[in-house]
Regions:
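Beta1-alpha1 glycine-rich phosphate/pyrophosphate-binding loop at the start
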Residues: 1-54, 59, 138, 145-188, ...
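FAD-binding core/adjacent interface of flavoenzyme oxidoreductases
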Residues: 51-141, 224, 235
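Short glycine-rich anion-binding loops that position phosphate/pyrophosphate groups of nucleotides
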Residues: 85-88, 151, 240-242
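A Rossmann-like FAD-binding core segment of flavoenzymes
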Residues: 49-60, 155-263, 269
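FAD-site-proximal beta/loop scaffold in flavoenzymes
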Residues: 98-128, 220-223, 228-299, 306
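Rossmann-like dinucleotide-binding core of oxidoreductases
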Residues: 132-189, 196, 207-209, 292-308, ...
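C-terminal, flexible cofactor-proximal segment of oxidoreductases
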Residues: 305-392
Length: 392
């Protein structure tokens, strides 16, 4: 919306790539390569004369002086859009992060991928049955879309995709356990879809533990209110918190640190600053808090760009209204759940819709083509091609 204007636009990011996060779990589970879902930011924006990209990190925001402070410099702004997303929340137990990585970045995905593959390699050469079982047990904490998709993908890896390559253990020796503190997984989905997802996971060999809170995590496993689960591979998908940079705005936030924004997505008292996406706490006209999903951020981005482009004064700005285009989650090969405009889909049809939507929203023909080929190859052969351990 702003590329055909006289505005000078500066995009600041601490990574040099745009990441398609919905498929990040497939990098973590060796289905795709990082380059399949990431594109250099500069290559995306090189054709726009008024956009400058800076590879840096914003440390704080001085809203009184209209300054964004970077690691070793600062930038003036007339308008500021803060779209910094969210990070993992370990609910005050930051020491768990080293043991139980979350999934937000490509680095996270590669760490998880190597943990999974390395666990299988270590199990292959282990003579102690008890220790071997720890290597063959994979625990995912959190039953939201990320946790469900990870659990399904790891189950396919451990019980189908890679199991033929190992001789010391059988598919039934592996355990995939999904832990959820609430009474059902996919709590933001329709209850019937949630139940279907649980049923599909269990058919794939995933043990789903509901109403189970994690008390602590150690190198040897997970302690829950129901007992101890011995495991060497633990993945965190249970909570998010806002970026600490938002604290420098000195405005009201929710418990997760998200900025409580005005109905035009601006910061109270500073109509020139907008906070969108996972960084924002926004209630719709019914008092419902908007979810932290990509379609919310995309719609808010376009909305805010329109306000800036048309230089609409604060008192005349329209109210942002979110249009829900549906929710979906994949569970495994030919297994998914989806709800689109009230229509509920499951199984193969939901999986086909999920596949089409995700390929469609990938940036670039090359990425779309490569992902389609990888998926077709896996569908026909049940084998993933990106199983390297490179961090050792």
């Amino acid at each position: 919306n702003l590329t055909d204007t006289e505005y000078e636009i500066t995009l600041i990011d601490r990574t040099n790539h745009h990441l398609f996060q919905p498929l990040l779990y497939q990098v973590a589970t060796a289905a795709l390569s990082p380059s399949d879902i990431a594109v250099p930011i500069r290559s995306l924006l090189s054709g726009y004369r008024n956009i400058k990209v800076i590879f840096d990190e914003v440390i704080s925001i001085d809203k009184d002086n209209h300054l964004a402070k970077l690691t070793d410099s600062q930038l003036n702004y007339d308008y500021l859009i803060v779209a910094v997303g969210a990070r993992h929340s370990y609910f005050g137990n930051s020491e768990w992060e080293k043991i139980s990585p979350g999934l937000k970045t490509l680095t996270d995905a590669l760490v998880i991928r190597e943990k999974i593959i390395e666990a299988l390699e270590l199990a292959e050469k282990e003579n102690n049955p008890e220790l071997m079982q720890k290597y063959l047990t994979f625990v995912i904490v959190g039953g939201g879309p990320t946790g469900v998709e990870l659990a399904g993908a790891i189950a396919e890896i451990a019980k189908e995709t890679m199991i033929k390559d190992y001789k010391s253990f059988k598919p039934e020796d592996t355990k995939v356990i999904l832990i959820e503190a609430a009474e059902r997984i996919l709590s933001s989905f329709d209850k019937k879809l949630s139940e279907q997802a649980k049923e599909d996971l269990e058919k794939m060999g995933v043990e789903v533990k509901l109403n189970t809170k994690v008390e602590t995590i150690s190198d040897d496993g997970v302690y829950t209110i129901q007992g101890f689960i011995p495991a060497k591979t633990i993945i965190w998908a249970a909570g998010n918190q806002a970026s600490p940079i938002l604290k420098s705005l000195n405005v009201e936030t929710d418990r997760a640190g998200k900025v409580i924004v005005n109905k035009d997505c601006s910061v109270p008292g500073n109509p020139e600053i907008f906070v969108i996406g996972d960084a924002a706490y926004f209630e719709d006209e019914n008092g419902k808090v908007l979810p932290g999903v990509a379609q919310v951020a995309i719609q808010q981005g376009k909305f805010v760009a329109g306000i800036i482009k048309n230089e609409i004064p604060f008192e005349k700005r329209p109210v942002f209204r979110y249009k829900d285009k549906g929710t979906m989650a994949t569970i495994g090969k030919a297994k998914a759940v989806a709800e689109i405009k009230g229509i509920k889909l499951t199984g193969l049809l939901a999986w086909l819709v999920w596949s089409f939507v995700h390929v469609f929203f990938l940036i670039g023909f090359r990425n779309r083509f490569r992902v389609m080929i990888e998926w077709i190859w896996y569908y026909l052969t049940k084998r993933h091609g990106t199983r390297l351990i490179v961090g050792k």
